[in-house]
């Protein structure tokens, strides 16, 4: 079988839970608990988002700034090195790991595409043997983390845009894509073979209408 272009979402598709919250909060609690009161600054952009006046990217940006702004690159790298191994060992779906291994054996081009950030997603991708990573970028000021986003939040229609660009970069390849939520459907529907993993009932109904297969992973 010829190689395929295979795109995996990360949070709740490969991993059992969200990754950004435990990554950032784990760092703060262990390394800089004095920053906890700064999370109050996340409330205003969250309210704006809930009222439809802002996008989720601004909430993410404010959260990252509250938790990590000003942190040295060496400290971020050290925390990432500590955070990723147990996440892969104990925080992933066995079925996801098996499917990744199958695609690697088949010689497929594996892309990890996530709304989570480039502080740690590329490390996860390397550890799992992915060929390429697309994720939300975060700005640095020299050796210190700024926390502003340098890319659009890689979610929803933005993922569909990135998926379309990937297909253009790899012409002639069949495509397989895995995601877990209704916000993944815009790019799953574009794939030759799209799979909704452990989706909600509402997401499953929408997936079936779009011809996206539904699977359950443990």
Predicted regions, residues:
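Acidic/polar active-site rim loop that often engages polyanionic ligands
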Residues: 20, 59-61, 142-148
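Conserved alpha/beta cores of soluble small-molecule-handling proteins
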Residues: 4, 31-33, 37, 50-56, ...
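Metal-dependent phosphoesterase signature
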Residues: 59-94
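C-terminal cap/substrate-recognition subdomain and adjoining C-terminal extension
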Residues: 1-3, 78, 85-218
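Active-site neighborhood of HAD-like aspartate-dependent phosphohydrolases
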Residues: 1-51
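Conserved active-site and cofactor/substrate-binding residues in soluble primary-metabolism enzymes
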Residues: 18, 71, 158
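Short, compositionally biased "basic patch" segments
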Residues: 46-49, 57-73, 132-137
């Amino acid at each position: 079988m010829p190689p395929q272009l295979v795109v995996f979402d990360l949070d709740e598709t490969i991993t059992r839970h969200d990754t950004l919250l435990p990554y950032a909060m784990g760092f703060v609690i262990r390394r800089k608990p004095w920053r906890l009161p700064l999370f109050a600054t996340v409330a205003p952009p969250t309210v704006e988002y809930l009222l439809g006046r802002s996008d989720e990217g601004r909430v993410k940006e404010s959260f990252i700034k509250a938790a990590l702004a000003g942190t040295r690159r060496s400290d971020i790298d050290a925390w990432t090195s500590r955070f990723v191994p147990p996440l892969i060992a104990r925080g992933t779906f066995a079925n996801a790991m098996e499917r990744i291994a199958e695609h690697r054996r088949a010689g497929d081009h594996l892309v990890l595409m996530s709304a989570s950030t480039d502080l740690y997603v590329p490390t996860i991708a390397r550890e799992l043997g992915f060929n390429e990573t697309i994720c939300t970028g975060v700005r640095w000021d020299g050796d210190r983390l700024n926390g502003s986003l340098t890319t659009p939040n890689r979610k929803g229609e933005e993922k569909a845009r990135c998926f379309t660009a990937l297909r253009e970069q790899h012409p002639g390849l069949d495509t397989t894509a895995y995601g877990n939520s209704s916000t993944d459907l815009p790019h799953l529907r574009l794939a030759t073979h799209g799979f909704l993993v452990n989706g909600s009932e509402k997401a499953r109904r929408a997936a079936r209408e779009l011809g996206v297969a539904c699977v359950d992973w443990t």
